[in-house]
Amino acid sequence: MKRSMYAGHVRSEHIGQELTLKGWVGRRRDLGGLIFIDLRDREGIMQLVINPEDVAKDVMEIAESLRSEYVIEVTGIVEERQQANNQIATGAVELKVEQITVLNTSKTTPFEIKDGVEVSDETRLRYRYLDLRRPEMLENFKLRAKVTHSIRNYLDDLNFIDVETPMLTKSTPEGARDYLVPSRISEGHFYALPQSPQITKQLLMNAGFDRYYQIVKCFRDEDLRGDRQPEFTQVDLETSFLSEQEIQDIVEGMIAKVMKETKGIDVSLPFPRMSYDLAMNQYGSDKPDTRFDMLLQDVSELVKGIDFKVFSQAPVVKAIVVKGNADRYSRKDIDKMTEFAKQFGAKGLAWIKVDDGKLTGPVSKFLTEIESLLTDALQLVDNDLVLFVADELDIANATLGALRNRIAKELQLIDESAFNFLWVIDWPMFEWSEEEGRYMSAHHPFTLPTEASAHELEGDLANVRAIAYDIVLNGYELGGGSLRINQRDLQERMFKALGFTEEEAKEQFGFLLEAMDYGFPPHGGLAIGLDRFVMLLAGKDNIREVIAFPKNNKASDPMTQAPSLVSEKQLEELSLQIESHD
C-alpha cells in the first residue's frame, strides 16, 4: 500500500484517520497483553499499539515476531494517547494497528540504534549505514542540506553561474600531495584529483563568466586529524572586476543568510577584521578564537635587564595570564603543560603565581626588581597564573597560542553557543618551510601581491604582502581567498621567486601563462570548507560527523575496505608494477 505520510509527521489533527506508515522497529514492549512498538523513520518516532482483541490472530503473531530494525508496513487508526510523551513530536497520538506486513527482517545490530550509544569510531564506520540511522546523525545531514540549499539560492540570486570543473586534472607541485590516477591510454602518465578548482575557476574568469560558484569535491593526500579528510567539499567562488572588500561583502551576506535560515541567528555585519600580524602576536594563531580573552603579551623589554639569562638573552619573552585560576594548577599540571609546550618547539615553560599580593614560583626570585612593573603591565591580582615562553617570536607565539586554547577548554572559558566570525587580512605572501629549506606560498602561487611590496619578489621575500583574506569561525579556518594575478609578467616573477626555472614554470603552468596573453581580467575569489562549516553549526568536533561515508585516520574505509589491492590484469592495463618493501 502507499505510505500515507512519514511516521514522524503524525499529529493530533490526524486523530480518527486511517494511515499506512512504513519504517523500522525501534523498541518493542509487551505490557498486559498489548504490544507497543516504536516505529522509526526519517522524520521521527510513532508509537504503535497492537491489541489482541482488535486484530486477527495472524497479525498478533507477526507483532510478536518483530525485532529491532525489522522493516515493516502498518495500517491503523490514529488515536489520542492516554499518557502523552512530551519528549517527541508525535507524543500526543498513537496508531491502533489493524494490519502489519514485514518488508524485511534484520540481524541483531552490532550496536543499538539510538543517540548517545557508546561504540568505537571504527565500528561506527564499519557499519556506517546503521550509524546513519541514529536521529542525531540524520539531523546533521538535514542541516547540511539546508546549508547547501541556502548557499545555492543566495549565489543564484547574485547571478553566479554554477559550473562543474574537471575531476581529472594536471598534477602541480605546490601544496599538499596529489592523489594520482594513472592513464591507461597514455602509458606512464597520470592525472591528479584536484586539491581545488583554483586554476580552472580562474580560466572561467578569462572566459568571461564573471561570477562562478561550485559546491565541489576536493582531494588532498595529507596527514589527517579531526577537521580534515582526504576528500572534502568546498564552496568555491570566483568573481571578475571586484575588490577584496566587495568579495568579502558577498561572502558575509552568504554566511548571514545561512546562519539565519539554519540556526535562526542574526549575525552582525560587517565581520571584524584583524591583521595577520596582530592575530599571531595577540592570539598566537592565524585562526584566532575570539570567544575568550587571555591574549598573548610581550614582556621582553620588562625582563631585559634581570639576572635570569633564560629571559634576558632570549629573542622575545611572551606571556599569558590565566585569571583567577592559579589554584586549579598544581606543579604536576604545569609539568604536563611544559611537555605540551615542547611539541611546538619551546625549550620549556616558566611560570609564576600571585598569592596574597606576592609573586611565587620558580622564577619569582628573579623578578623582584620588576615585580611592581610586571604586576601593573599584566594587571595581575591574587590567584592569577602567568605562563612565560622565552624563545624565537614564531615559537613563542605558536606555543602560547596552543596553550591558550588548551587552557580555555580545560577551564570552560569558551561560550559554546557563540559564533564569532572574523577576517584575517594583510597576509605575508610567503612562509619559510624548514622542511623544504625555502619560501613557500602562504596560500598559493596565484595570489596577487600588494603593489607596494611586489618589488620584493626579487628581494627579500619575507617582505612581500598578499592581497589575501581568511575567514575564521571560533578558532577554525573556515575559508580563504585572495585577489589573483592576471598579468603574465607578474605571474612569471612569482614562479621565479618560488624557485621555478622558466622551463619548469612553462611545463607546469604553461597553459595558464598563455591564457594571460588573451585579455585576462582582474579577478579574485574564495573557498569555504563546507564540511568544517557544517561541523561547527552542528556543534560537533569532527567532520566525520557531517560526512556520510568518511575515512578513518588512516585514510581508509572500514566498511568497503578501501583502499584495496587490485588485480594483476588491472595493473598490466595501466603499465604499473608494485614493488614490495618487505
Curated annotation (Swiss-Prot):
It catalyses: tRNA(Asp) + L-aspartate + ATP = L-aspartyl-tRNA(Asp) + AMP + diphosphate. One of its GO terms (molecular function) is ATP binding. One of its GO terms (biological process) is aspartyl-tRNA aminoacylation. Its EC number is 6.1.1.12. L-aspartate binds at residues 174, 220, 443, 484. It is found in: Cytoplasm. Its main location: cytoplasm. It is an enzyme of class 6 (ligase). InterPro entries: Aa-tRNA-synt_II, aa-tRNA-synth_II, aa-tRNA-synth_II/BPL/LPL, Asp-tRNA-ligase_1, Asp-tRNA-ligase_1_N, Asp/Asn-tRNA-synth_IIb, AspRS_core, GAD-like_sf. Keywords: Aminoacyl-tRNA synthetase, ATP-binding, Cytoplasm, Ligase, Nucleotide-binding, Protein biosynthesis. One of its GO terms (cellular component) is cytoplasm. Residues 198-201 are annotated as: Aspartate. ATP binds at residues 220-222, 229, 477, 529-532. HAMAP family: Asp_tRNA_synth_type1 (MF_00044). Catalyzes the attachment of L-aspartate to tRNA(Asp) in a two-step reaction: L-aspartate is first activated by ATP to form Asp-AMP and then transferred to the acceptor end of tRNA(Asp). PANTHER family: ASPARTATE--TRNA LIGASE, MITOCHONDRIAL (PTHR22594:SF5), ASPARTYL/LYSYL-TRNA SYNTHETASE (PTHR22594). Homodimer. Belongs to the class-II aminoacyl-tRNA synthetase family. Type 1 subfamily. This is Aspartate--tRNA ligase. It comes from Streptococcus uberis (strain ATCC BAA-854 / 0140J). The gene is aspS.
